[in-house]
């Protein structure tokens, strides 16, 4: 019998004055062990026994090893103590004006920071948790309380969990406020330190559970679900089984919130609830299959929200955010396969990226289109039923879908997940036919190899046709290749082919039109299309008023402006297009479509970045942030440029609503260099919370006037990020974004600095940033 853990019984006794805890842990072993090596970080182990007998143990830097031979049913008892962490990982302290809470973030390897354990997703066990706290506090864990005893202190003993991985355990302590709802016999509980204004998040949760139970054919497994608002939280949200944690902003959405906040909240809640089946009920064996958890939850969250909010057109956002972001990232040479070999725990956080989430989700969308909607759904249901309460691999899922659909899903998926990158399909008209060939697409313009089995779709005059393109293909009729941008590849048309597509423009969906524009921008960056040709072609889309098309064009033109602000033709093209959109959208109207409100906010903030005169006029409306939350970021950026950081800091202290407050904080990155030095003071003071630093530091290098300051203070910024966001990968992503901007003016200095600060935990971000710098330098010289 292989060694394993049957059950953990852990009692946490918290001292809420100095935020320490003492703990007694009982581990029920399964199978035979020779020395028990437990993961343990920053824990002080006092005593270890086996079946009541004292045992010798050795403490390493991040382990405690109990020496000896052990057998099935043996019981290990460990006494230990520790401090509650001040980072945003492990068992940590989260402070806000409304109070203090103890919370946990254990994914991917944070459980070892709270208690000795085998911190490995395949070592599933039952958890029996007891928490001892001051009697005026409450405690939350994955299961409902079994017993609560109150005398001098409060003892909360929770029901046993199902078998689950260590990273899904949750412990929360605080003076909480609650709102409740019910779905069937499942208690839905919204938790916050702040007053709760709306049950909107519970409504989303109820609809999501209902959708998933119907889609998977499997009931939700636990008797309750907490949605927990955490004031200081490094991740966006976390799928702890039955006790899901979120940043405050995700759970503060109400029926009257801005469209951006409502939609983001719905997608986030639906994503985490999808994990209750895909990740919690069935878990990957090791982190190389992390993508399976995250990509599936990403794809399903959009399907879920689309099922009850058609008016949002959420798959337009999916295609731009998830597919578009992944296509950009995966065209670098410093990409990685969807299924990546993970050995070092420091590597895990860096694969929580566009590939694990966006590419994986986009591949699932492509396979659903290839296998068929119902066949895909039945395959998913079979996979979950076959592996419930256990662990599985990606191949198990492909086999299930293949068994149902009868198509070679496993062969197709194995190639797509084990190989980095993706193809560009070239379409060349030859006589009365169209010749299709493929090669790997690289953003640096080099020509790649690779022969993907592409589930190709073609819109023809007679309808949609599908085929599996292995190397090349020839077709007689073509309106457009890659129908609804369902495939994860780009399409390059020769002149005649492109004319054919544009003649049929009115027949194309907005997802199809987005594909044309997205590919055009990628071909500009890679040098396949000249700047003149790009500008000529993109102007052909300027009359398209669809929200997805406007957002994509606005993003492209603003991105080019930020790359080279002193390029007159880019600045004039961007300002002209954005101004026309702002005028066309006009002021907010009562009862208007949420998509209109959302795109108004986006083009207005982009214009505030591009046009200082517009920003100066818009800044006068800074006092009206609450009137239209979708315009809050635009007005805040304008105020940052016109008034400075003191005005923004005062407003941030005034607004307790995170929907507005976070946008004010983000806009601080757009202040002048003389103001930016105050950012560190505001972090120390708490005006900028630890979790919100990343918004400021991601905007600062995008701001042409903020780049010198960022570079001069990069060591301090990295140190702050690493301390606050240990194990999350955020530092890596900030550096990936910043390095290309910083290097345009100081190429050699930035390359040298990148090597000086390089560490394993953000090595990937530095490599991607340096590669992107080389690419944008070439484009910069052409603009």
From Swiss-Prot:
Protein known as: Tricorn protease-interacting factor F2
EC numbers on record: 3.4.11.-
Residues that hold Zn(2+) according to the record: 271, 275, 294
Hydrolase in keyword set: yes
Site features described as Transition state stabilizer, chain residue numbers: 357
Entries under PANTHER family matching the protein: PROTEASE M1 ZINC METALLOPROTEASE, PUROMYCIN-SENSITIVE AMINOPEPTIDASE-RELATED
Function noted in UniProt: Proteases F1, F2 and F3 degrade oligopeptides produced by Tricorn (themselves probably produced by the proteasome), yielding free amino acids.
Binding site for substrate: 107, 236-240
Family the entry assigns: Belongs to the peptidase M1 family.
The organism's place on the tree of life at top rank: Archaea
Pfam annotation, one family: ERAP1_C
Keyword terms, alphabetized: Aminopeptidase, Cytoplasm, Hydrolase, Metal-binding, Metalloprotease, Protease, Zinc
GO biological process, one term: peptide catabolic process
Cofactor note: Binds 1 zinc ion per subunit.
Subcellular location(s) per record: Cytoplasm
Family matches, as Gene3D superfamilies: 1.25.50.20, 2.60.40.1910, Neutral Protease Domain 2 (1.10.390.10), tricorn interacting facor f3 domain (2.60.40.1730)
